[in-house]
From Swiss-Prot:
Signal peptide: none annotated. Acts as a guanine nucleotide exchange factor (GEF) for CDC42. Promotes formation of GPHN clusters. The keyword Phosphoprotein applies. GO terms for cellular component: cell cortex; GABA-ergic synapse; postsynaptic density. One of its GO terms (molecular function) is guanyl-nucleotide exchange factor activity. PROSITE patterns: DH_2, PH_DOMAIN, SH3. This is Rho guanine nucleotide exchange factor 9. It comes from Mus musculus. The gene is Arhgef9. InterPro entries: ARHGEF9_SH3, DBL_dom_sf, DH_dom, PH-like_dom_sf, PH_domain, SH3-like_dom_sf, SH3_domain, SOS1_NGEF_PH.
Amino acid sequence: MYDLITGDSIVSAEAVWDHVTMANRELAFKAGDVIKVLDASNKDWWWGQIDDEEGWFPASFVRLWVNQEDGVEEGPSDVQNGHLDPNSDCLCLGRPLQNRDQMRANVINEIMSTERHYIKHLKDICEGYLKQCRKRRDMFSDEQLKVIFGNIEDIYRFQMGFVRDLEKQYNNDDPHLSEIGPCFLEHQDGFWIYSEYCNNHLDACMELSKLMKDSRYQHFFEACRLLQQMIDIAIDGFLLTPVQKICKYPLQLAELLKYTAQDHSDYRYVAAALAVMRNVTQQINERKRRLENIDKIAQWQASVLDWEGEDILDRSSELIYTGEMAWIYQPYGRNQQRVFFLFDHQMVLCKKDLIRRDILYYKGRIDMDKYEVIDIEDGRDDDFNVSMKNAFKLHNKETEEVHLFFAKKLEEKIRWLRAFREERKMVQEDEKIGFEISENQKRQAAMTVRKASKQKGVNSARSVPPSYPPPQDPLNQGQYLVPDGIAQSQVFEFTEPKRSQSPFWQNFSRLTPFKK
């Protein structure tokens, strides 16, 4: 290490933990930051640089990149270093090596080393913290422990099985010949358990924050750490490890693929494993984003007048699409103009106020789990006795009930049909990984709405749809991307006939307050 630094080699390290400090000569960073190591003469404290900032930092808070090389400008996957002993407690650097097999061996050894260290962290959490907490019924309830630790024991059991299979595939004599790609593919479904843990992590942090205000809990958790002989990291740092770990797999596999020759027996398996793990992390991040947006859904529901039935969050967590259409509920029924909000599992129907177009009234909902979508060709419908254009139906598979919808334009109809397919796909994926909103998260969203109502006043709320992802293709440009604070009258204005307003109504609405 010292030879590399004094030899003008660029030695880079990645932060494994957040280092929060107020000291002038210490370097603050977050997990994932890349640090240029300038001095490693002290085994415990190194001197490093991030951008223009330099300072001391704990050596145990970082991991050295597997491969280091001179003059690197491409990032962590393009940096090279010497051999890594997977059984050691640190990464040992030697002279830069250009041999591709050696580079692959370095990455394999790093993967094995980090997996073994990760298993130890999980064991420390389960035995050092969770096991001790269960003994103190006077301090922790079962519900509290579920919030704080989530499904960490399930993750521990899964990782032990995963590492056992990795060890079987590891070639100790020639690490570059190891075939670990199939292990990721065989266990790909098991990695979805991280979704529940990541979704719960924010609740865990909030619960810990409340407990840590009491010195009893501070002393208890510190005693647990010392008893288990764990490194000097707070409990919230240990609980962050699984979240960081699942995000690291695509980075490690991408680096492994780079140093794997295409004629290597493991190449196609590593490539497939990289695609799988990227999809897992992408879906986990997407579901975490959805949970972060549930406050907006709760706020939107609170702004809709005359709400009836269960809350949106009881079944749904994402607004997929919204728009205004003509709707006929039953044969020979009257054509009605409604604003529709398609969530996962349900579609909510609302009616605009006749004068205040930014105010919505609740008019019902459709359970999408019971309905199928039927595309209808233009022409006459004998059942409803109407001429149809840009129409589609929702058919209840149990009761044979049918709803008929008319879009303004063909493009809008296509967007709705695509949205319905997306809704079904989302529901199936959520069921596959067991995604759901916890009762604690629902309570937090409700509290946020109540606080906002007290601050702004109930009458100031407007029926603005919650945000959702941007369009994926040109056809989706018709989606209503509504930032917070914009009234719906601005959003849906194009669907209303243009007419000038009488001065009488302008004066009336200004001078005569009344309750809707």
